[in-house]
Each structure stands twice: as structure tokens, then as C-alpha cells.
């Protein structure tokens, strides 16, 4: 279904009752306090909450930091860059990207992170695991690359690089088509434009759909993707939701199913940047339809469900960051259908790169700029 955003009266004002660093904006659910938590980050890309409430944040040039002193994340203090992060390809759209905590982080202190790995001739998407050591100086130990994208190398674009872990401990990773290799998204002999599923040690689960198929990469779970930069498990159903960038128009949200073909570049709803036609059509037998798409593009990045939102009207909603759209997009759901869209925070004029629901029930997001910020959205008091 095509996007049809609703508009609520939008404004901005100072709120004496809110924290001093907060602004108040209006939304369909009432007034919101938008608080700046941290500043001075260079193109922050991903957020992950540590058990004590502090934040682990990645910066695209290749740094990982912890935000917050002790359990007081709101103080905005940035740690020094963590030692142990591998060298990244920090050019074009490449760099250090997503980070998530292992489901058993409290026991093993394991994290997973995705980055553009430099190699002769370009770069490729890589997924690594490491142990986060917090004291006395935060660092990464036992770093091990558990997946490397195979296929034509990228000159700097479309790395994908979002991670999700399911209840069976398996890891999902998005990979992009490297922009110039869009036809490769339909080729099962490489990892371009795919959703990858592996075990935490990098081995392949035996029930992956293309295990044993001649010429197919066994790590592939689904294919026909362009540049997926949103990945989240729907807590109501356990299903994996993904979003990806279209070209000029045609950004998509998909519900991912085992072995399915999501169509890029054969079908879609966009056109090339020069106005040329890309797709055969918008539909084709054997290829999946998105549950939602945007024309014109919003350039989606980051995605989070909000089952425990501080705002009752938002519980169960899906939130998507918008880079070109410069907004936080709220999608109201009825089962697996999007029934309403609201564009939040356009007043900030910020490229929103990642969004997460915090343990406090507030929404937290990162803005993508050379002086990037981490912000928190909660009801205004």
C-alpha cells in the first residue's frame, strides 16, 4: 500500500515543565518533549541500550562509544572511542554501521556489529562479534569476523548492514546491492541485495532455504533487496520486518519470509535518478509485494516497534527514521497492515538515522550529521 501521511498541527515551543534542553512539539497524540541527550557525534549510525541504561553508539567514520556515566545516560557524557574496532571503509556510504547486543549479553558481554570492510578494489559488508569490556577503559576484545559478503565489491554505496537476532539465537543481516550491481540482487550465487541468516559463530543453520542448492549461497534467507537499512522483529507476531531504500521513489517495508524474492530490480515503484525506467512492472508472479511504500522517497533508516511506549496511543506502532524525509515516521498498524502514517518532528530538519525504544518506554533516535545528536522523545509534562 502506498504511503498516505496524515498531518497534525505542527509547532514548536519552549516548555518550562520539561527539562531545560527539551523542546515541545505537537503530534496527533499530544505534546511531545524532545530532549537532546548527547551531541558531538560524527554521523552516528546505530544505538544499542546496555543493561544499565547507558547507550552504545556507532559513528560512521569507525568509532564506537558509550554514552552516559555509570547508569546516568542522560548526562550525555561520551566515552573515548573503544579500542578494538577493526579498520573500516569510511568513504561514500561506508563505515561502521549497526550494533546489537547478544540476547545473553548479561552472561557473555557479546555484541555484534556490521561495517564496510576495506579490501583491494573496494569494500564489502562484514559482520563481526566481540566481547565488550567496560572497565577500566571500555574496549572490544576477542573480535572475530563471522560473515563477509561475497560478490562484486562496492565503490562506496549500498552496504545494507542492519542486524537482528531471533529467539533461537540466529542472526539476520541485511546486505545491499552495491548500487552498480543491482541485477545481482536476483543472483543466488552471491550475497548482494540479500537477507543473510547465520548462527552466532558464523556457521549456516541447516534449515536455511538454499542449503544444498547448487550454485546458491547457503547463508541467504531472502533476496531481491536493494539497500535495506531497517530490520526489526515484530513483538506481537515474532515476524521479521524490513525496510529498504528505493531509487527515486519506491522505498519499501516488507515482512520477510523464508526463501522469498522481494523483486528488486525486476519490480518496484520507483524510477532511476535520471528519470529512466528500471522495473518491468510493479507486480510479477513469484515476487513479493511490500506492505507499504513511499513515493516520493523518504530514505528510510532504522526501525523500531514500540510495544511499551510511554504514549498509550503509540503502543504497538512502528517507527522509521527518514533521512531525506527529515522526520520520524509513525506507522499505526492493524495486524500486518499499515492503516495510518504520521510524520513527526519535521521542525528539527534532521536526517534521522536510527530509532530505538528505550527501556524507559521513550523513543530515542540519532541524527546523521557531522555534529550528530542523540535525542529522546517522551510526553511533555
Residue spans of the language-model regions?
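Loop-centered beta-sheet repeat module
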Residues: 189-198, 207-236
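Beta-propeller blade signature
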Residues: 126-135, 188-201, 256-257
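Surface-exposed loop and turn segments in beta-propeller and other repeat-based domains
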Residues: 77-94, 142-159, 200-221, 265-295, ...
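Bacterial N-terminal signal peptides that target proteins for export
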Residues: 1-9
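Acidic, Gly/Ser/Thr-rich repeat motifs that build Ca2+-stabilized beta-propeller blades
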Residues: 22-182, 230-233, 238-246, 296-334, ...
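Short, conserved, GDST-rich strand-edge loop motifs in beta-rich repeat architectures
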Residues: 173-192, 250-252, 256
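Conserved blade-ending motifs and adjacent loop-strand segments that build the rim/top face
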Residues: 225, 338-359
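N-terminal signal peptide c-region/cleavage motif recognized by signal peptidases
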Residues: 17-19
Amino acid at each position: 500500500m502506498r504511503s498516505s501521511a496524515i498531518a497534525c498541527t505542527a509547532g514548536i515551543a519552549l516548555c518550562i515543565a520539561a527539562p531545560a534542553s527539551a523542546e515541545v512539539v505537537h503530534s496527533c497524540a499530544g505534546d511531545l518533549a524532545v530532549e537532546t541527550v548527547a551531541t558531538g557525534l560524527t554521523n552516528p549510525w546505530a544505538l544499542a541500550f546496555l543493561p544499565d541504561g547507558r547507550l552504545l553508539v556507532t559513528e560512521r567514520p569507525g568509532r564506537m562509544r558509550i554514552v552516559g556515566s555509570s547508569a546516568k545516560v542522560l548526562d550525555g557524557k561520551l566515552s573515548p572511542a573503544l579500542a578494538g574496532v577493526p579498520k573500516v571503509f569510511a568513504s561514500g556510504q561506508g563505515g561502521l554501521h549497526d550494533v546489537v547486543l547478544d540476547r545473553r549479553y548479561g552472561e557473555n558481554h557479546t555484541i555484534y556489529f556490521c561495517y564496510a570492510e576495506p579490501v583491494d578494489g573496494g569494500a564489502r559488508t562484514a559482520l563481526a562479534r566481540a566481547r565488550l569490556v567496560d572497565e577500566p577503559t571500555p574496549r572490544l576484545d576477542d573480535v572475530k569476523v563471522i560473515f563477509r559478503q561475497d560478490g562484486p565489491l562496492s565503490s562506496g554505496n549500498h552496504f545494507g548492514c542492519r542486524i537482528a537476532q531471533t529467539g533461537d539465537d540466529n542472526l539476520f543481516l541485511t546486505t545491499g546491492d552495491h548500487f552498480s550491481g543491482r541485477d545481482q540482487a536476483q543472483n543466488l550465487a552471491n550475497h548482494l541485495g540479500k537477507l543473510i541468516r547465520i548462527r552466532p559463530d558464523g556457521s549456516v543453520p541447516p534449515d536455511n532455504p538454499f542449503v544444498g542448492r547448487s550454485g546458491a549461497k547457503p547463508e541467504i534467507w531472502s533476496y531481491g533487496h536493494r539497500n535495506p537499512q531497517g530490520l526489526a522483529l515484530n513483538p506481537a507476531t515474532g515476524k521479521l520486518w524490513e525496510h529498504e531504500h528505493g531509487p527515486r521513489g519506491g522505498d519499501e517495508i516488507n515482512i520477510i519470509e523464508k526463501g522469498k524474492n522481494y523483486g528488486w530490480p525486476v519490480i518496484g515503484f520507483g524510477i532511476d535518478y535520471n528519470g529512466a525506467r528500471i522495473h518491468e512492472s510493479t507486480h510479477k508472479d513469484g515476487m513479493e509485494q511490500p506492505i507499504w511504500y513511499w513515493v516520493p522517497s523518504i530514505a528510510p533508516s532504522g526501525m523500531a516497534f514500540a510495544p511499551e511506549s510511554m504514549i498509550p496511543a503509540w503502543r504497538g506502532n512502528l517507527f522509521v527514521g527518514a533521512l531525506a524525509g527529515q522526520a520520524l515516521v509513525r506507522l499505526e498498524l492493524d495486524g500486518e497492515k499499515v492503516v495510518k502514517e504520521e510524520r513527526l518532528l519535521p521542525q528539527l530538519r534532521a536526517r534521522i538515522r536510527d530509532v530505538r525504544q528505550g527501556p524507559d518506554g521513550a523513543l530515542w533516535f540519532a541524527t546523521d550529521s557531522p555534529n550528530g545528536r542523540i535525542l529522546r522523545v517522551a510526553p511533555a509534562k
